[in-house]
């Protein structure tokens, strides 16, 4: 599975041993350098029926894990994308062919895209340093994003502040930007990006969005009305440990970095660790699974920090969790096929939002409830938000539909952010105009 080089060390029971393991893991990562994916391919499989979907699902249970689902088996109408290590390609292709599963090669060599990505980042970093600037059209490390946050807050202190809502498993600060024009107990909107660490386009979109808010306040009537009446909170790096690991070691890491005594594999899927429907369909009890839900609801500090903050605030009216990829806008439920009580309103709002998004660059999104549009998923952010009384709960899946997957070129950051902004603006305006 992803992260195998870091997954074979068993932590001891004491805090001292845990610190020792973390130090050892850091040293090991530094010594080994970034994982190499030369020859790894992303295959796209189109299942004809539920039986073929089940055959694809069986691949996740193989030990050791032989595939990494980028888009898992959901329904026959949706493609399944999976990364296959070079060493497993022959066997996996033979498995697909023997069961009559048609496939195509979406990405011929993942390492080629990774090399291009690193070269683009290095070039951008040199330019930023020489001009003492920050590029919104480039990807950045955790350290660079946190440095930008400090500068951003200092430059726009009249409207933006920084709040630390907790610490990650590896003791990174969990930071939230608060956009506010003052006043007490304003109703609020929550936006988070990067809960799955390899989805870099989401962090970049969040950063651009933050800058858009301060740039357009006072100029864009809709945004100005929103911010005069409501506060906006943006968590740019929801999974800081995992995100740092995607830069230092494994670009394709999804989960957080929590470790537990006696468990060989590292990390929990933070979007399966919420209380609503915890442990149900669409999550996994196997710690080595990419959708491992963790030992208990909100066991992960990254999730608990959000729950505690939103609950203590008590006046959030919308929550928007931004993921990639697939070009979708969805609302609850994920764990149930039954519609929520205000399903018609959410459907109409999602329709308006994707229409606004489409007008920017002509990118098409599909929309609907999570369980009927994508797949059944339990213990997810938006289900928890909705069950906690946040009426307008949405989840984005940003660009693209599989040509690059999680390795979306930096040249697409700005257009992705621009179109996403129009959808966000639509949702926020509706929230403003429909108080509850």
From Swiss-Prot:
Tissues in which the UniProt entry reports expression: Expression is very low or not detectable.
Residue pairs linked by disulfide bridges in the UniProt entry: 265-288
Positions bound to Zn(2+): 196, 199, 323
EC number: 3.4.17.-
One Pfam family it belongs to: Propep_M14
Subcellular localization: Secreted
Presence of keyword DNA-binding: no
Family matches, as PROSITE patterns: CARBOXYPEPT_ZN_1, CARBOXYPEPT_ZN_2, PEPTIDASE_M14
UniProt binding sites for substrate: 196-199, 254, 271-272, 324-325, 375
Domain (Peptidase M14): residue spans on this chain: 138-431
Cofactor binding remark: Binds 1 zinc ion per subunit.
Active site, UniProt feature: 397 (proton donor/acceptor)
Cofactor entry: Zn(2+)
GO molecular function, one term: metallocarboxypeptidase activity
Cross-referenced PANTHER family: CARBOXYPEPTIDASE A5 (PTHR11705:SF16), PROTEASE FAMILY M14 CARBOXYPEPTIDASE A,B (PTHR11705)
UniProt protein name: Carboxypeptidase A5
């Amino acid at each position: 599975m992803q992260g195998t080089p870091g997954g074979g060390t068993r932590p001891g029971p004491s805090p001292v041993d845990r610190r020792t393991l973390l130090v050892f893991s850091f040293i090991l990562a530094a010594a080994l350098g970034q994982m190499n994916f030369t020859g790894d391919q992303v295959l796209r499989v189109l299942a004809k029926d539920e039986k073929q979907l089940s055959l694809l699902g069986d691949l996740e249970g193989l030990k050791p894990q032989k595939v990494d689902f980028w888009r898992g088996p959901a329904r026959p109408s949706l493609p399944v994308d999976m990364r296959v290590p070079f060493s497993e390609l022959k066997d996996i292709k033979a498995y697909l062919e023997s069961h009559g599963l048609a496939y195509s090669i979406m990405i011929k060599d993942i390492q080629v895209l990774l090399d291009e990505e690193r070269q683009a980042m290095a070039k951008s970093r040199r330019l930023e340093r020489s001009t003492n600037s920050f590029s919104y059209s480039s990807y950045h490390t955790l350290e660079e994003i946190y440095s930008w946050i400090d500068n951003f807050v200092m430059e726009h202190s009249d409207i933006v502040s920084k709040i630390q809502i907790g610490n990650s498993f590896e003791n990174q600060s969990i930071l939230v930007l608060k956009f506010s024009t003052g006043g007490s107990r304003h109703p609020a909107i929550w936006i988070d990006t990067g809960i799955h660490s390899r989805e870099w386009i989401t962090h970049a979109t969040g950063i651009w969005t933050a800058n858009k808010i301060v740039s357009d306040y006072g100029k864009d009537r809709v945004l100005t009305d929103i911010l005069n009446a409501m506060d906006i909170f943006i968590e740019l790096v929801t999974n800081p440990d995992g995100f740092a690991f995607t830069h230092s070691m494994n670009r394709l890491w999804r989960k957080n970095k929590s470790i537990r005594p006696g468990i060989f594999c590292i990390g929990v899927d933070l979007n399966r660790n919420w209380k609503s429907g915890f442990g149900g369909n669409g999550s996994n009890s196997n710690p080595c699974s990419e959708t491992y839900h963790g030992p208990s609801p909100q066991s992960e500090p990254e999730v608990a920090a959000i729950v505690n903050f939103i609950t203590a605030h008590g006046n959030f009216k919308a929550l928007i969790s931004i993921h990639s990829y697939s070009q979708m806008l969805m609302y609850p439920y994920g764990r149930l096929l039954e519609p929520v009580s205000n399903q018609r309103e959410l459907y109409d709002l999602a329709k308006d939002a994707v229409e606004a998004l489409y007008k920017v660059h002509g990118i098409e999104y599909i929309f609907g409830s999570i369980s009927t549009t994508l797949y059944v998923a339990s213990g997810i952010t938006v289900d928890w938000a909705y069950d906690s009384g946040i009426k307008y709960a949405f989840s984005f899946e940003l660009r693209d539909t599989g040509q690059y997957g999680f390795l979306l070129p930096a040249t697409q950051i700005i257009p992705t952010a621009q179109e996403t902004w129009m959808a966000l603006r639509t949702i926020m305006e509706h929230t403003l105009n429909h108080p509850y």
